[in-house]
Swiss-Prot record:
Changing R220Q: Loss of enzymatic activity. Secreted effector that irreversibly inactivates host MAP kinases by catalyzing the dephosphorylation of the phosphothreonine residue in the pT-X-pY motif in MAPK2/ERK2, MAPK3/ERK1, and p38, via a beta-elimination reaction leading to a dehydrobutyrine residue. Is also able to remove the phosphate group from phospho-JNK in vitro, but JNK may not be a substrate in vivo. Could help suppress localized pro-inflammatory responses at infection foci in the spleen and liver, and thereby facilitate bacterial growth. The active site is at H106, K136. It comes from the Bacteria. Changing F100E: Marked decrease in enzymatic activity. GO terms for molecular function: lyase activity. Belongs to the phosphothreonine lyase family. This is MAPK phosphothreonine lyase. Optimum pH is 8.5. Its EC number is 4.2.3.-. Changing K134A: 2-fold decrease in enzymatic activity. It comes from Salmonella typhimurium (strain LT2 / SGSC1412 / ATCC 700720).
C-alpha cells in the first residue's frame, strides 16, 4: 500500500525516549494520578465505550520496512534507516500536549507473526482516534533471532499525558484503556500467537499480548521487586482495575 514520500531533506531522528535511571524523582504526573486515583477511576467507569475509526489505505509491514529516511502516512512521520532496528512512527501534529512521563506498552507476538500482527493492528495504530502519538515496531530483518525485541516486545507504544500541565485527564485515560483492550481483541481475533513478554514488564492475566512498564522508574533487567512496584503504579492500576 502507498506511502507518501515528500521530496524534503529533513533531519528527523528516531524517537529519543528518556532512559531509565535509579532514584528518579516521582514526577507531578505520577503524584496527580496517586492523589486523584479514586476520582479518576470513578469517572472512567461512568464513561461510554470509545470507538476508534480505523485508518484506511495504510502501509503494510513490507511498506513500513521500505519507509526509509522519511515518509508520511495518515499524519504520521515514518522512518526506518541506518543501524536502528526499529521502524518509528510519530504523529506530525501530536494530540497529547504533556511531557512524556515514562508510561509505555509493549506488544509481544510470535517472531514469525509480526507482519500478520501489524496487518491486524495497522488501521488502529494509524487511526486519527488513537491516543498514541508515537510508536515503533521492530524491523525483523535487522535483528538476530534470539534478541529481546525479536522474541517479544516487537511493538512499543509511548503514552504521553494529554494536558499541557503534563497531567492525564480521565477521558484520555479511559480512551487509552479502551484502545489497548481493542488491540488485544484484534490480535486474538486474527489468531496471532503471543510472544515472550519482557522480564521488565507487568501485565494482568487477561492481557495475552500487551505489557506495561514505566521507564523512568524501572530498568530492562526487571526482577520481582521492580514488577511489584510497577503493579502499584497508578497509571497501570487505572488501565487494569
Amino acid at each position: 500500500m502507498p506511502i507518501n514520500r515528500p521530496n524534503l531533506n529533513l533531519n528527523i531522528p528516531p524517537l529519543n525516549i528518556v532512559a531509565a535511571y535509579d532514584g528518579a524523582e516521582i514526577p507531578s504526573t505520577n503524584k496527580h494520578l496517586k492523589n486523584n486515583f479514586n476520582s479518576l477511576h470513578n469517572q472512567m467507569r461512568k464513561m461510554p465505550v470509545s470507538h476508534f475509526k480505523e485508518a484506511l489505505d495504510v502501509p503494510d509491514y513490507s511498506g513500513m520496512r521500505q519507509s526509509g529516511f522519511f515518509a508520511m502516512s495518515q499524519g504520521f512521520q515514518l522512518n526506518n534507516h541506518g543501524y536502528d532496528v526499529f521502524i518509528h512512527a510519530r504523529r506530525e501534529s501530536p494530540q497529547s500536549q504533556g511531557k512524556f512521563a515514562g508510561d509505555k506498552f509493549h506488544i509481544s507476538v510470535l517472531r514469525d507473526m509480526v507482519p500478520q500482527a501489524f496487518q491486524a493492528l495497522s488501521g488502529l495504530l494509524f487511526s486519527e482516534d488513537s491516543p498514541v502519538d508515537k510508536w515503533k515496531v521492530t524491523d525483523m530483518e535487522k535483528v538476530v533471532q534470539q534478541a529481546r525485541v525479536s522474541l517479544g516486545a516487537q511493538f512499543t507504544l509511548y503514552i504521553k499525558p494529554d494536558q499541557e500541565n503534563s497531567q492525564y485527564s480521565a477521558s484520555f485515560l479511559h480512551k487509552t484503556r479502551q484502545f489497548i483492550e481493542c488491540l488485544e481483541s484484534r490480535l486474538s481475533e486474527n489468531g496471532v500467537i503471543s510472544g515472550q513478554c519482557p522480564e521488565s514488564d507487568v501485565h494482568p492475566e487477561n492481557w495475552k499480548y500487551l505489557s506495561y512498564r514505566n521507564e523512568l522508574r524501572s530498568g530492562r533487567d526487571g526482577g520481582e521487586m521492580q514488577r511489584q512496584a510497577l503493579r502499584e503504579e497508578p497509571f497501570y492500576r487505572l488501565m487494569t482495575e
